Amino acid sequence: MTNIWFDVAEVSVGQHWYWQLGGYSLHGQVLITSWIVVAVIGVICLLGTQNLQPVSGGSAATAPKGLQNLTEYITEFIRDLAKTQIGEEDYLKWVPFLGTIFLFIFVSNWSGALIPWRILELPNGELAAPTNDINTTVALALLTSIAYFYAGISKKGLGYFKRYISPAAFLLPINILEDLTKPLSLSFRLFGNILADELVVGVLVSLVPLVVPIPIMLLGLFTSAIQALVFATLAGAYIGESVEDHH
């Protein structure tokens, strides 16, 4: 008798398991995997910030270890990224935003590369990394757009919109088009790379023994990390551009 919980689902694209909420249809499988990713990040953060050991005098006995060391390394990495992209004056307030974006995309991408979501069969569609769904990547890109508009307007007020006619008024359509293409490029780049990686691995696993797809899976881990870094770096660059003083 076939066990529906451990049947390998077929590789499919564009099929969704819909949840009905009022008059709206929600992509259930995306919400499930997104909640799992958020839970994993939350647990790691909670465990990594318990019983914090302060460093005094560079002593090895008081140096952070384990998850605390990992969380401090990630925090310093995000802080340095924000400082490089946004600038010394404004970077600190944007560290939480860039850190959240980076961690969510990183863990989502790696969950798609490491967790065999497809062994769990759904009534329709299949489980996959949250970033394998265009709705997720578009939402992340729109959040980034809102963030850099907010950053620019909060610092410069309505004077922020002078950038659209700088250095010449005839550049107005081009500058508007640039702001429209930023979220498009962010969302489709991330979605396309993650979808392609999961499809290639899924097809290889179904056609050949498990050992053969391993190099592709390792490459997928590397690509997943790079995509998270690229998204966070571009988000920081866009915010830095919006708060930059033009003379």
UniProtKB/Swiss-Prot annotation:
Gene Ontology MF: a single term: proton-transporting ATP synthase activity, rotational mechanism
Main location (coarse class): plastid
The entry's keywords: ATP synthesis, CF(0), Chloroplast, Hydrogen ion transport, Ion transport, Membrane, Plastid, Thylakoid, Transmembrane, Transmembrane helix, Transport
Location of the protein in the cell: Plastid, Chloroplast thylakoid membrane
Pfam families, A to Z: ATP-synt_A (PF00119)
Keyword hit for Cell membrane: no
Taxonomy, superkingdom: Eukaryota
Transmembrane regions: 28-48, 95-115, 134-154, 199-219, 220-240
SUPFAM superfamilies documented for this protein: F1F0 ATP synthase subunit A
Gene Ontology, cellular component aspect: chloroplast thylakoid membrane; plasma membrane; proton-transporting ATP synthase complex
Membrane topology: Multi-pass membrane protein
Assembly with partners or alone: F-type ATPases have 2 components, CF(1) - the catalytic core - and CF(0) - the membrane proton channel. CF(1) has five subunits: alpha(3), beta(3), gamma(1), delta(1), epsilon(1). CF(0) has four main subunits: a, b, b' and c.
Function description: Key component of the proton channel; it plays a direct role in the translocation of protons across the membrane.
Protein family per UniProt: Belongs to the ATPase A chain family.
HAMAP family tied to this protein: ATP_synth_a_bact (MF_01393)
UniProt protein name: ATP synthase subunit a, chloroplastic
Protein source organism: Chlorella vulgaris (Green alga)
Organism lineage string: Eukaryota, Viridiplantae, Chlorophyta, core chlorophytes, Trebouxiophyceae
